[in-house]
Amino acid sequence: MAEDSLRVGMISSGLAVLLNGEDAKENSSKARIVPHFDYSGHRPLERTIEFIFGLAEKSVGPLDGQVDSSLIRAVIKNQFSKLHGDLDVSVSQREGISVVHHGVGPPIVGLEEFSICGDIRIVKPPLVLESLALFSSARANACIWKGKWMYEVALETSGIQQLGWATLACPFTDQKGVGDADDSYAFDGRRVSKWNKEAEPYGQSWVAGDVIGCCIDLNCDEIYFYRNGVSLGAAFTGIRKLGPGFGYYPAISLSQGERCELNFGAYPFKYPVDGFQPLQEAPTRFSFATELLRCFSRLLDRPDRSLADTLSRLRRFASVEELFCPVSSAICDEFFYILEQDPLLAEYLGRGAFLSFLLETFRTQAPHDSSSLDKVLDVFLEFPQSHLIFEHVVNALACGCKTATLILTECPYSGPYPYLALACHLFKREELMVQWWRSLHFEFLFEGFLSCRSSNKHDLQHLMPVVWWPGSSEDISYESSMGFTISALSEAINKIEEKQRNLCLLVIQFIPPVSPPQLPGSAFRGFLQNLLLKNRGADRTLAPSGVTRNSVLVSLFSVILHFLSEGFAMLKSSEAVHHNVGFLHRGGQQKFPLSLFLKNDPHRADITRLGGLFSHISKSYPTDDQEEEIMRWEEGCMDDEQNRVTHATEQKPCCCLAYDTDLTKSLKDRGKNTAQSSRGRCSSIPERSSHVAAECSAGSFSEEIDDKPSTSNQSDPDFGYRPVRFMRTALQESRISSAILSEEELLDALLLLYHIAVAPNFKQASYYMSHQSQSISLLEETDKQIRERASCDQIKRLKEARNNYKEDVMDCVRHSAWFRISLFSRWKQRGMYALCMWVVQLLLVLSKMDSVFVYIPEFYLESLVDCFHVLRKSDPPFVPSTTFIKQGLSSFITFVVTHFNDSRISNTDLKDLLLQSISVLVQYKEYLEAFENNEAATRHMPAALLAAFDNRSWIPVTNIFLRLCKGSGFSSLKNGESSFSSTVFQALLRDACINDGELLSTFLNRLFNTLSWTITEFSVSVREMQEKYQVMEFQQRKCCVIFELSSNLARVLEFCTYAMPQAFLAGTDTNLRRLTELILFILNHMTSAVDDEFFDLSLRRQGQPSEKVSRGILLAPLVGIILNLLEASEDSKPKQQHDVIGLFASMDCPDTVYYGFQYLLEYNWDGCVSGDDAYVKKLGQLENFLSHLINRASSQEPERKEESFNKDTTDIEDNTCCICYAGEANAMIAPCSHRSCYGCITRHLLNCQRCFFCNATVIDVIRDKEEEEEEDDDGHKRST
């Protein structure tokens, strides 16, 4: 392993190997012995002791009698001390440094309290810091003016931190810190800049877990920074020389919430730099103690040394077993005596040489040498002082997990693995587990063990030096090379996650030694609750201080997901394997304690519920009588009989099917969205674990899990399958101690962890995967242009652009591959699918209970929806899309269609989330079929969609309508589109409109208003660009979006005229009149406002096909609207409908009408519709319509002129409507008695309930008596 910390103290990996002699061959029970060739006459016992302690030959005099610890101590104090006593004499000159020292004892380098500006909290003594103020700065108490010095900073967070050096003259304020003044120098990896009054680009971006080395060379007047031992180059040169007392101080500045750990030399550096000294002087006698550990290492019987090496050192043999006890006891006596002499030595050794000694004894890679390590622990733990050094060992192991770097050549035993493996073995010792649990920083260290260092662009370049993607021009060997790399990294991640699970299981099994006695799981439960409490608000834009690292939360999510999905196998005996069914895969009766929702626990106080805040809901829905209840139901009870797929049915859900996908092969098949058939190597467990397979074939899944404290394993033999699918019972289990770690509580924590930590990672993964596709397209387009261009200048620019695009693609490929490795392993996908099944059934069951449903936390719904879509879009795909919903998640369809307009959900963003899910799913044929086959969707969704079309949700509703109504418009004549139509929902939408006239009227009014607004906005945006004589990217993007929205709305309106033409042709003519005005309004803006060339320029973006932005996209629905109304008019009796042609002819803008329809006839429809006979026939109908319109307008022209003349020469009658000046004022508004025509009043009241004369609230509209008596044959009142 390449970690420097594993080599601190230079402990030799060579241990005394005692090979079997002839006597051992005869009796295998005897101890191993070292070969003996007695050429010198020296006895073997003395020679063996000399070898163990590294003494020269004959240094130990003849020994008579038995060797005991007192004799060995004498050897240590005499011969060994003489040989190594001068090791701790400082060889290097520590001139040029002074440490401000307060009190007695050796000087300790730390922060100078009076220098702190802002608010810095000590998270963990001595130097784990966090800024609580917006900007905090501080200096250390060490001043340097000569020599080469360094200190290290381990980043707990990766935000804005300025690390470096400053003099006393550097002022610290709430806005200025290190690097913001003369003689002040800093590096900030978040902004990738160095600071000395001004910022300049420098270095690499940093991530949480990085170790930054801050080095200053006052001999050459230079400052360097290192990231994980790699030099970032000289940051500053020619810095000013200063004298004693006026030198440079280590200094840091942190923004709010940023954390780091400073090491000035209190323990060995993780990445020491040759020639640079630590600011804190090393403790005395640390080298002597290190040599003692080296001696102990030689004492161990290890079979990994060669025979030749042993024979070259030893020429005689002696029994090691006889020497181990006295020698090891004497070494430990001396070792702990040294520790007592210097209080600083325990930390220096515990985080340095002693840790390296343990790691090398145990081995950093499998197979581990547990027996040798146990022998070491047995000896050291006999000494009461051992707790001093093991406390620092645990600290070092946790810190090592935070900062360990994955190295490809060391996979799979790389990164945090060696530290986790050693920690798991140590904590099997009860005394060490108790010591860890009793420490003040148990939870902080536990978080450290669950940490994993992140990777930035440069790290991924080292992890994946070779990159390949489908269609790349790279050598074919790159594909296999990247495949091997992904396999190696996947295995490494699996090893790390396995050790994290082992550690958590140890904590779960641990029983704290307290009174009254606690049950297993209480320690883990307390840690989990405190962690969630600390991370309240972690999902906010500005997270509060103290928030845990994302990697900790993600690791904990993986641990809990594995427990709930794959079971607690490591807690079970081999006889109980058949009972070990994961909680999420356990079929039959399900249950959930309502107390998780109805109790306002501290870690839930700030969590928003579906109905709002807990304090607000509790006033309307008291919870006193429900807190102790358990909700029970049968799996699948909320599904339709024909769609029900459960763990108990013959057809199994997707999470229990053997779809095995090779992660490396997904590189070849990106974008195909098909599951692979080969078995992957990215999981440490079988792709279809045995207990899941057993569960799928079992008939009952409510067996009690042996040795597992849980509230979810109680069976109710009397429940069975009853007509009442779910029931509520008193919570008898609640009388058991609350320290029990229940699986339902783990599920609750799992969803919250997903919401605050895992979901953001999936969003990043989605970004890189989608950006990769875009970058590949740009790269391919650039390659095409290079082949077609002949100009040298153009080729040069294109090649530069190509290099940039290629770098972008490679970066995206690496990030995408890393996310697939870390997030999309097979068992995680299986567990997440089962999680979605479980949660959606829970929500549907609780939805029947208003008093409980409103208390469900919002993150339940958000996590469910996000997890569902992550699995749906996963790459490689979890299962084929044709079975994704059908075999297990049909309940999800039921939930989204019944709750996207649920009044009990107070947060409109959540309703939008459900609505957007529908909008996305109906874009795919296989998912649309699932909607058509879902009873709740066909019964509830059509009317609910019409009602949801409002000022907030009109965009997703429009997209849904557009998908459902495909194939019913003029533009659908284009080949292929009609094959994706949904005749089922088209009929359901038509029926919903016919059966609810008020709903239809409201919907059409909103549709008219919205389309008018989008057309106006589009026209204004185009005009603004034309006036500025340039097309700005933002304005162009805005125009494209508004144009697309307008086209979509027009197509929805076209469908309305196709499916329910009588809404426009019968009844009042308000809808038809508004439709006519809107058509002319659109035609006017599309044909006269802007010239064609600028219009196309304002819409067309790079890489977008011309047919997607042509005028025909918006004009085609207008043709369809007119033709739909004409066809409906021909099928109805003339007296029962309004005159469409007459209404167009009566408009006051005949020129707009004529030129608009003439433009439609002459427009080139290529790309919008196909050129078949149906298309020609449709245009022929439009031409006939225009002919009739011209004739009607011509016949009405004399009458129009006469009417216009009369208006100019006579006064307007008192009874004429003063709004439209076209009709008679035949209605009165109550209570203000203002009069107008009934048509104007009703149209106004569609959007406003106040009088348009005096703004009084309208109570009633009273029509004149003779008007009320005028009715047509169907009983509809005629419009005046």
UniProtKB/Swiss-Prot annotation:
E3 ubiquitin-protein ligase that promotes the ubiquitination and proteasomal degradation of KRP1 and KRP2. A zinc finger (RING-type) spans 1217-1252. This is E3 ubiquitin-protein ligase RKP. One of its GO terms (biological process) is protein ubiquitination. It catalyses: S-ubiquitinyl-[E2 ubiquitin-conjugating enzyme]-L-cysteine + [acceptor protein]-L-lysine = [E2 ubiquitin-conjugating enzyme]-L-cysteine + N(6)-ubiquitinyl-[acceptor protein]-L-lysine. InterPro entries: B30.2/SPRY, B30.2/SPRY_sf, ConA-like_dom_sf, RKP_N, RNF123/RSPRY1-like, SPRY_dom, SPRY_RNF123, Ub_conjug_fac_E4_core. One of its GO terms (cellular component) is ubiquitin ligase complex. It is found in: Membrane. It comes from the Eukaryota. Its main location: membrane. Keywords: Membrane, Metal-binding, Transferase, Transmembrane, Transmembrane helix, Ubl conjugation pathway, Zinc, Zinc-finger. Residues 82-269 form the B30.2/SPRY domain. It comes from Arabidopsis thaliana. Induction: Induced by the beet severe curly top virus (BSCTV) C4 protein and by BSCTV infection. Gene3D superfamilies: 2.60.120.920, Zinc/RING finger domain, C3HC4 (zinc finger). PANTHER family: E3 UBIQUITIN-PROTEIN LIGASE RNF123, RING FINGER AND SRY DOMAIN-CONTAINING.
